[in-house]
């Protein structure tokens, strides 16, 4: 039977760790760099006894009830065993002692230290000491001859010496090791060992083999090696019977040889490849306890029988099968269980010549095709090396029959056999876990700790219960539940408590929800899963619950217990988290190699419009790490933490990528310290976690205290002022992306928070620009200005001008113009997208009034109604062009005059995007925002309804079109009733409109309403220049069809003009505006009121009959009409 490896468990903090058995084999004793000696009853002992012997313990030895330790205060101490009572100090050194061993009867100890000395001390009388001098470097290891005649020692000076104890002389010295100046720099600690009982052989690990020397003659007998050994051997130890020798390497390989036959009996690989630094053979049975350089403790069982025979008469494990077993999902997933402590049997490599019939069966693939033997073995199984037959024929023995078919013969392993390819090795899959929980094997554990509360589980002899505690007791009071169904998974939200248990032979896996926020009397529900399907992960959201099962299914439920969607996962689930409408799933998307996990992530939104944000993208992890925590920030951004302490957050502003925002290991004082994350906040920026000294998770008692860590992005040169400001700027950007997400999805947030963040970011950019300007990095200044808002760019231009950086100021001015043009182009595109969207909604339903049909017309009607209500006590009907499409490109919000029906040019209300204004509060105003602002300024007593509707036209605040249903008001409803679209109008309606029109026109002879005239701005010099040169631009560029192209070309030509020419055009614009105003005033005085009324009646009738055919007037006409109306006010 091959050796069985049990999963390793945490023993001590990271560093050199040693292990030994007591005389009876009842206890395993370990010591480590944490200064503790732990006494384990077995590997499953969850509460080992410990003795603190000092700050660090470098070595320990146990014999006859005496525990001897070499500690960091340069002493060799004695404690009673197992009581752990101090029993004095045996000896002292000037530096640390590196190794201590007992002799055969336990009366003496030998210790070697870094001061080059070796001492033998009598345990009962510490004054009886012998000192051995001769090494020229620190002593690595020691070993007593079983007959107490010789003492062997290895040193950093590269030599292995054998001392005559009686006269303290060196009997022999071999230069076998690499030289070094300290133990920490030694490639191997070279733990050598004498053969028990007879002391016939001395085993020394040298490089990749074990050298054996004969006693007294000191001749080299032979080497023990294996083709699987790829790294230096660190330690050797003999079985109590003296027939087997075990060795451990610095890459985690443990090999056992039969010394007599030189056969390799067992090969076992450390599950994580850590260096083996402690090996101890059980005194009575075939068990080997081992420790690694990370402080972990492991155990091999059924290694070899102490009587000299293997524990199984036949070698049933074959190398081909072992290689296939590496990819066995069930066994390997248990082998790398980070959170569960169940024993896993992993067969080791055992040598043997394979029977032909059995070999054919084992070489069959899952698909039914035979595996090519050439991929596994170099030679046929029937071919045997001649040299092997000559040297091993005397060792060929036929084994006893044990009921199995065929006979298998053991032959010595020869170097001519080609080794199997050992890499890359697949990484054991991480088992499912619940974020905020501690391991299942603990009797008192946290089932979950999150921002809502804590769920503890107690499973001991007295009680099996679950306690629920809320951080805010106003949500719910603390609850105590009996755990009769053995619930192992839990989650907690402000609405419910969710529990799940695995299936048993009698009961199915269950999902239990305690819906304490329900308004009815039924506060809980339970759902049984189908047979052979277990719940592996659960989570709660707002109004829903989710459970991932072993059948690779994810089941969704309402919080009240209604089953909803069920869909398949692409791999076994690792963990889940929920927040609001978001569901965050991490699963295995493949097999990882060389210690890396291969995980995928899905992010779904389960609102009314269900959609998937992340479609199984790979989840980035630190090398050789695993997932430790997933969840959401308090603001709803997905985050996760790996076992190396790296916290990553979803960066929605960079294509949903993952950005590392904190390294918790930087805040740890010791190498074995960790932080256990319980929550993340973006505003304020806080990482809430629990410090764990010497562990990865906290105990339940005493109640752990939560610490707050700050975030820091891993930017370069963080010690410099430039690096600090860059890190602060991008951290501010990342941690305020959630505001855009909230606005996009219709959630409420404080506008002041966003304004404060923008202000903070612009201040950092200005500081970086000033720093770059001082360092003569003008190109870098322009790059920084590209990240600024329009106002900040204006400040940057002023700063550059005052700093006499004229070229920089010119570049920044060009950048400001480009940013304004880009902003205008973006707004035009958004308007076109909005029009296309609404056209699609109205496609095929041109005569059907919808909520999207004419929102701009609604706004106009409501504004006119408000104005008319303020001007007159009576409501008066107004004229609008029937059947006009508000969303066509030829018209917009300002193209139809509400009172007169006159048409104005569509760009009259738009701010010049190419004019840089330092006094403006916003970088640039879109047409809609400018229009809304002016309307709000005019409406002194504006209602909530009109305000809400005007806000919908602001593209900056509402990037996504969403219908707003206004509350009905009698006044506005009556005013709007005059403007409903009708396909057929009666003569009576026309007559009523004509009469009302006469009354309106007689009282108000204006051409345009006040709210539209206030949007008119004086012409600029560039506009007048563009009017006169438009024909030249079109003749030079006949392919120009878009007004934006004409304006851009005009800007380029206008910049070429000299300063004097530009001033001439500017003065011309001012003069024309003034003259137009004067002319309007004169016309108002001259025109006779009666004649004007008749003319207006005729024009109104024409407009009513020809409203659909009328085209917009040219630019100059609209300008004059607007100015005329403005002056009439």
From Swiss-Prot:
Transmembrane segments: none annotated. The keyword Acetylation applies. Residues 848-857, 883-897, 926-936, 945-956, 974-987 have a biased composition (Polar residues). The modification Phosphoserine is found at residues 333, 374, 383, 387, 868, 917, 919, 932, 984, 1041, 1090. There is a cross-link at residues 397, 1127 (Glycyl lysine isopeptide (Lys-Gly) (interchain with G-Cter in SUMO2)). WD repeats lie at residues 11-50, 52-91, 92-131, 134-173, 184-223, 228-267, 271-310. The keyword Transmembrane helix does not apply. Core replisome component that acts as a replication initiation factor. Binds directly to the CMG complex and functions as a hub to recruit additional proteins to the replication fork. This is WD repeat and HMG-box DNA-binding protein 1. The lineage of its organism: Eukaryota, Metazoa, Chordata, Craniata, Vertebrata.
């Amino acid at each position: 039977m091959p050796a069985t490896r049990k999963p390793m468990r945490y023993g001590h903090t990271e560093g050199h760790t040693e292990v030994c058995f007591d005389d009876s084999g009842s206890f395993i004793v370990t010591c480590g760099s944490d200064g503790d000696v732990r006494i384990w009853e077995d590997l499953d002992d969850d509460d080992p006894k410990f003795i603190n012997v000092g700050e660090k313990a470098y070595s320990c030895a146990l014999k006859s009830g005496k525990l001897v330790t070499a500690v960091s205060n340069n002493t060799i101490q004695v404690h009673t065993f197992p009581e752990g009572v101090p029993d004095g100090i045996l000896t002292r050194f000037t530096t640390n002692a590196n190794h201590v061993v007992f002799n055969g009867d336990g009366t003496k100890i030998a210790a070697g230290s870094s001061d080059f000395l070796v001492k033998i001390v009598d345990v009962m009388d510490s004054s009886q000491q012998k000192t051995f001098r001769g090494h020229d470097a620190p002593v690595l290891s020691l070993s007593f001859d079983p007959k107490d005649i010789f003492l062997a020692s290895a040193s950093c000076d590269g030599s292995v010496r054998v001392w005559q104890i009686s006269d303290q002389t060196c009997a022999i010295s071999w230069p076998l090791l690499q030289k070094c100046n300290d133990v920490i720099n030694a490639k191997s600690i070279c733990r050598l060992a004498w053969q028990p009982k007879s002391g016939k052989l001395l085993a020394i690990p040298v490089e990749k083999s074990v050298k054996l020397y004969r006693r007294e003659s000191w001749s080299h007998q032979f080497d023990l090696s294996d083709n699987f050994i790829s790294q230096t051997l660190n330690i050797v130890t003999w079985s109590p019977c003296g027939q087997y020798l075990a060795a451990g390497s610095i890459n985690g390989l443990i090999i056992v040889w039969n010394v007599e036959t030189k056969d390799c009996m067992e090969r076992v690989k450390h599950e994580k490849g850590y260096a083996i630094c402690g090996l101890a053979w059980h005194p009575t049975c075939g068990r080997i306890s081992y420790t690694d350089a990370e402080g972990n403790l492991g155990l091999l069982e059924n290694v070899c029988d102490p009587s000299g025979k293997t524990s199984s008469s036949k070698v049933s494990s074959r190398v081909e099968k072992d290689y296939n077993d590496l990819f066995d999902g069930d066994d390997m997933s248990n082998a790398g269980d980070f959170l569960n402590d169940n024993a896993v049997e992993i067969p080791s490599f055992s040598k043997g010549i394979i029977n032909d019939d059995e070999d054919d069966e084992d070489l069959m693939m899952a698909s039914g095709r035979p595996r090519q033997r050439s991929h596994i073995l170099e030679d046929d199984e029937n071919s045997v090396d001649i040299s092997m037959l000559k040297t091993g024929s005397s060792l060929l023995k036929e084994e006893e029959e044990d009921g199995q078919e065929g006979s298998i013969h053991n032959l010595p392993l020869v170097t001519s056999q080609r080794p199997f390819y050992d890499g890359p090795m697949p990484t054991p899959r991480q088992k499912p876990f619940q974020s905020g929980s501690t391991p299942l094997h603990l009797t008192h554990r946290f089932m979950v700790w999150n921002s809502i509360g804590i769920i503890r589980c107690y499973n001991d002899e007295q009680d099996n219960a679950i306690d629920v505690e809320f951080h805010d007791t106003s949500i719910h009071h603390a609850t105590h539940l009996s755990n009769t169904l053995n619930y192992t998974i839990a989650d907690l939200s402000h609405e419910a408590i969710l529990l799940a248990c695995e299936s048993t032979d009698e009961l199915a896996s269950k999902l239990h929800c305690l819906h304490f926020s329900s308004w009815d009397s039924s506060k809980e529900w339970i759902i049984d899963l189908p047979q052979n399907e277990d719940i592996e992960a659960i989570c709660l959201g707002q109004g829903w619950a989710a459970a991932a099962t072993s059948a690779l299914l994810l089941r969704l439920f309402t919080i009240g217990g209604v089953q909803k969607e069920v869909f398949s996962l692409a791999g076994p689930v690792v963990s889940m988290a929920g927040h609001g409408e978001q569901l965050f799933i991490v699963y295995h998307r493949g097999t990882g190699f060389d210690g890396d996990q291969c995980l995928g992530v899905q992010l779904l939104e389960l609102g009314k419009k269900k959609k998937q944000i992340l479609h199984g993208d790979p989840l980035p992890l630190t090398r050789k790490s695993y997932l430790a925590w997933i969840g959401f920030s308090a603001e709803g951004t997905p985050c996760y933490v790996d076992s190396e302490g790296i916290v990553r957050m979803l960066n929605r502003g960079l294509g949903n990528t993952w950005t590392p925002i904190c390294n918790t290991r930087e805040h740890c004082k010791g190498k074995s310290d960790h932080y256990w994350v319980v929550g993340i906040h973006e505003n304020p920026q806080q990482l809430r976690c629990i410090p764990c000294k010497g562990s990865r998770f906290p105990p339940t008692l005493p109640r752990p205290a939560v610490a707050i860590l700050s975030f820091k992005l891993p930017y370069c040169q963080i010690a410099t002022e430039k690096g600090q400001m860059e890190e602060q700027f991008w951290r501010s950007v990342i941690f305020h992306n959630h505001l855009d997400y909230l606005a996009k999805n219709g959630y409420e947030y404080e506008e002041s928070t966003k304004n404060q963040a923008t202000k903070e970011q612009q201040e950092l950019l200005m500081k970086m620009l000033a720093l770059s300007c001082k360092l003569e990095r003008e190109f870098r200044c322009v790059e920084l200005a590209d990240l600024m808002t329009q106002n900040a760019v204006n400040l940057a231009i002023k700063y550059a001008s005052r700093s006499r950086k004229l070229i920089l100021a010119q570049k920044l001015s060009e950048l400001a113009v480009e940013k304004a043009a880009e902003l205008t182009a973006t707004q035009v595109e958004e308007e076109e997208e909005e029009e296309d969207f609404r056209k699609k909604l109205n496609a095929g339903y041109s005569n059907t009034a919808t909520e999207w049909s004419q929102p701009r017309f609604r706004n106009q009607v409501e504004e006119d109604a408000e104005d008319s209500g303020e001007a007159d006590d009576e409501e008066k009907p107004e004229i609008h062009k029937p059947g006009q499409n508000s969303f066509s490109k030829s018209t917009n919000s300002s193209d139809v005059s509400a009172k007169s029906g006159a048409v104005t040019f569509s760009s009259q209300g738009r701010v010049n995007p190419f004019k840089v204004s330092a006094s403006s509060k916003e970088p640039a105003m879109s047409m809609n925002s400018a229009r809304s602002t002016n309307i709000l300024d005019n409406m002194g007593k504006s209602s909530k309804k009109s305000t809400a509707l005007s806000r919908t036209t602001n593209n900056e605040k509402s990037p996504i079109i969403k219908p707003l249903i206004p509350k009905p008001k009698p006044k506005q409803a009556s005013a709007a009733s005059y403007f409903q679209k009708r396909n057929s109008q009666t003569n009576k309606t026309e007559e009523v409109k004509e009469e009302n029109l006469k009354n309106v026109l007689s009282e108000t002879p204006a051409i345009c309403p006040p709210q539209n005239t206030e949007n008119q701005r004086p012409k600029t010099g560039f506009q007048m220049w563009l009017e006169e040169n438009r024909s030249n631009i079109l003749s030079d560029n006949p392919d120009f069809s878009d007004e934006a192209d004409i304006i851009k070309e005009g800007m380029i030509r206008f910049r070429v003009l000299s300063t004097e020419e530009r001033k001439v055009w500017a003065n011309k614009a001012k003069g024309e505006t003034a003259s137009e105003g004067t002319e309007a005033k004169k016309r108002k005085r001259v025109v006779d009121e009666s004649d004007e009324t008749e003319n207006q009646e005729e024009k109104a009738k024409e407009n009513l009959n020809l409203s659909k055919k009328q085209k917009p007037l040219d630019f100059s006409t609209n300008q004059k009409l607007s100015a005329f109306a403005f002056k009439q006010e």
